[in-house]
Swiss-Prot record:
This is Ribosomal RNA small subunit methyltransferase H. It comes from Rickettsia canadensis (strain McKiel). GO terms for cellular component: cytoplasm. The keyword Metal-binding does not apply. Pfam families: Methyltransf_5. One of its GO terms (molecular function) is rRNA (cytosine-N4-)-methyltransferase activity. It is found in: Cytoplasm.
Amino acid sequence: MQQSHIPVMLNEMLANLAPQDGKSYLDCTFGAGGYSKAILESCNCYVTALDRDPNVIKRAERIKQNYSTRFDFIETNFADSFAKLKEKKFDGIVLDLGVSSMQLDIADRGFSFLHDSPLDMRMSGQGLSAEEFINTVEEKELADIIYKYGDESFSRRIAKRIVEYRKTARINSTGKLAEIVRNSIGFRKGKIDPATKTFQAIRIYINDELRELERFLANVQNILNKDGRLVIVSFHSLEDRIVKHFFKENSEKPVARSKYSKDNPVIDPNKWLKIITNKAEAPSDKEVELNVRARSAKLRAAKAIYEY
């Protein structure tokens, strides 16, 4: 049975984005459309949504029918969106990182081991598939990827078992990969399946998720209006670390001219952000109870104090 598509930390996202009538907003990760629809319903504003997954186009078209000129959709990865946005600027930008509930629920996409399906994991349907990767990657590189992107302490044991198995048969399904991972470390009863971290690591690597986040952040100031807000929901410690570092490095800091100066502190003009969330916000216990996918979510927000 498919889980309903529940937007993660929806109320917190709206509170930090603070949509206003007549303003324009960018939803960088359309997915099932939960954020876009909520922003459109909150006030008489405009939303442009992005997604590289062609499977979401029909859902975007339905929202377009309901909101007409207030909604626009572009099929693109957010890291590659700047040219397609044609120098358009926004009063708020939101990113909901990671895999969407819709992608997890469609068995043929190969993101989840809850169904035995083809081992794919590509968000755009293009490039190297998880099956191609898992059957060709060297053992050491595989172990490093599982450790780095999955925080998996048994990464070397898992990589060794995968390489041993593929000498006898090709690994071509999510069920088979999950079985190999479980057998390599033992199936421990608990809330989280032993294969979860390995699947997460392979997905992040296949879709180049961390580098794409860094590429987007490096250029985001060019499309955010003064006083515009940037709200990012992450699900992995490495994602959150990138966002936290970016906010810190680009946030305003009063700088005294000298310790003896009586002048008022000045602001470094290269620091163009003001952090809204002093620390990462987490979902409520009630939300996690209703939507287990929210359990690792963290939200950070900042506001542009200069316009580029």
